[in-house]
């Protein structure tokens, strides 16, 4: 059995610069529950503490700290309170191969653990694991005032020894130092809460104390005020390295002047009546019989003392409520990010997935579901695109939606159409549109061959600009926006395949008799608009044509950048 615990201690205190592994620590903590196991573990630890390797000694102190904090209650403190010589670290102290900073960190950690054992031997109490509130004045165990003062003083001594273990944020990038620092922060939170409880208890009875006890209480309170500042700084380092530190609430630190004034007045009254025992002196009974001026002064002092007492009791009530909901630390087994008050926002940003899609706010479209009817047109939701026109003959059109494509120009044609209304004065349908064809710079235009082919791109565009139907018999007809009415059939022969069909809106005829306008916001890159205007007041007859592949790609890019959302 002895060899087992020796191997466990050696495994937990390897020379490797890393925290002790749980597979070694857990059996060691369990072994503290038996007297024989504790003896074997402490013997193995004493050997490791007398080593000359810095990491071995430092990790041995960590194991000892874990035994005090998480092992069998009181047994480790009791053992080492009678064996304080082990904390002298004679061998490593006489070696010169370690830097001064390394030795300082080792010695301060060693001194803190030694102080914990000394204070336990002096008072017989572990303030971290015992219920300190049950030992306060007026409780069942009824500590005397001297004992209460001793406990508060002991807590301040332990905290002072702890906060001397100073580490910078860069130091705590070392996982071994971070592990020890986390244990220290856990102890600091518990010790400071116990100290805060003790100070509150002393201040509650301060105005009823004897001069001797009041002076000692005032000195402890001053130390508490100074210590609070250092504790807050220490915990800020913990936040900076990612530890979850609960909000620390403590008794007010602004009572020093009031307590000193009360103590001076009480001392003067004590000197005026030396025959009366000092311990029986209270502000409520200190009434001078020499003059009415002294009588008024006593009443004033009494009211001030009562106000301070009520203030202290109210803070005590708030603190007790806060301490009941005390939070626990998160064990930083892996490096954690530093605390940021805007952490929630950063987390939301980190969770965003960027697909480099063209951003088109104020425009949403529903993807049409494939059906057997090629003339079934899905209704599109429109925000940026508003279309209001009057007509009586709807004409089917199809829209290709291509999501999740990058907004990049790859040398093909990129066009953006912008339509602006022109008033012609011809009845209700007196609006015409202006077509702006913008072609990306650095691209090639189709070669103009002057062909008479009716299906060529040049002839189709010329036909669309020249076809006007005047004198329509319908007085409510709204002339429609000129667009590029091209139907590109797929190479597979299926004219209804979604990814191969690209159609721009034909003449779209609405049933609203009120004249409207078509606004289309283009979001393309650098453009060179060429303005072409035309007027028409009748129906538009739109031919269809086969389009070369490069023109199909041009139109696909156009629709990806500015999808045409037509509401029929």
Swiss-Prot record:
GO biological process, one term: clathrin coat assembly
Basic and acidic residues: bias regions: 262-283
Ranges of residues in domain ENTH: 1-127
GO CC annotations, alphabetized: cellular bud neck; clathrin-coated pit; clathrin-coated vesicle; cytosol; plasma membrane; prospore membrane
Glycyl lysine isopeptide (Lys-Gly) (interchain with G-Cter in ubiquitin) cross-link, renumbered residues: 282
Keyword set includes Secreted: no
InterPro entries: ANTH_dom, ANTH_dom_sf, AP180-like, ENTH, ENTH_VHS
Entry-annotated residues carrying Phosphothreonine: 449
CDD domains recorded: ANTH_N_YAP180
Domain of life (superkingdom): Eukaryota
Bilayer topology annotation: Peripheral membrane protein
Gene Ontology MF term list: 1-phosphatidylinositol binding; clathrin binding; clathrin heavy chain binding; phosphatidylinositol-4,5-bisphosphate binding; SNARE binding
Region (Disordered): 262-302
Keywords, alphabetical: Cell membrane, Cytoplasm, Endocytosis, Isopeptide bond, Membrane, Phosphoprotein, Ubl conjugation
Compositionally biased tracts (Low complexity): 284-298
Pfam families for this protein: ANTH
Transmembrane segment boundaries: none
Subcellular location field: Bud; Bud neck; Cell membrane; Cytoplasm
Protein family membership: Belongs to the AP180 family.
Note: Present with 6800 molecules/cell in log phase SD medium.
Function field: Involved in endocytosis and clathrin cage assembly.
Quaternary structure (record): Interacts with PAN1 and the clathrin heavy and light chains CHC1 and CLC1.
Stated name of the protein: Clathrin coat assembly protein AP180B
Gene that this polypeptide is encoded by: YAP1802
